[in-house]
Amino acid sequence: MKAVTATNATTAEDLNQRGLDLLAGGAAPEAAEAFRAAIAVDCAHIEAHHGLVRALRDAGRLEQSIAAALALTALTPADPLAHTALSISLQRAGHVPQAEAAAARARVLEWKIQLQSPPEQAGPGESLQNLSLPIQGTVP
C-alpha cells in the first residue's frame, strides 16, 4: 500500500478523509499514518486527532493511543469527546482508575455544556403533556 504523506494529498482534510476511509476498511495502522500526516499539515485539525486516537487503539497500540488522546485533551480541554476517547483508551489498556477519572471528567464537561445551553421553550410539564406512548394490550 502506498505510504501516506502530505505530498500524496495536499490538505489536512484530504488526509483526514483518507484516514477515515482506511479505518473503515480495517487498515488501522495505515489510517494512523494518514491521520498523523493530516496533523503534520494542520496541527489543529481536531478530527484528525480523534481519528489518530481511534486508529491507534484499533491497531492495538494502546499506549500510543493514550498519548494521542492526552495530546487531544490538551488541545481541546473542554471537549467531552476528547476525554471520552482518553477514557476508552485507558480502559482498553487496563488503566481502570484513570479511565474512570477521564470518564467522570467527560461527564462533568457535558453537564457544563448542558447548563450553558438555553432552556427548552416548553414550560414545566409541557413536554410530558404532549408525550404519547403506544398502548399495548388492554387494561382490565
Identify the role of each PLM range.
Residues M1-D14, V139:
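TPR-adjacent "capping" and linker segments in tetratricopeptide-repeat scaffold/adaptor proteins
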Residues A9-V41:
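Alpha-helical segment of the N-proximal tetratricopeptide repeat
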Residues G25-A37, A59-A71, A93-R105:
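Structural signature of tandem alpha-helical TPR/SEL1-like repeats
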Residues V41, A74-L75, V108-L109, I113:
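Structural marker of alpha-solenoid helical repeat scaffolds
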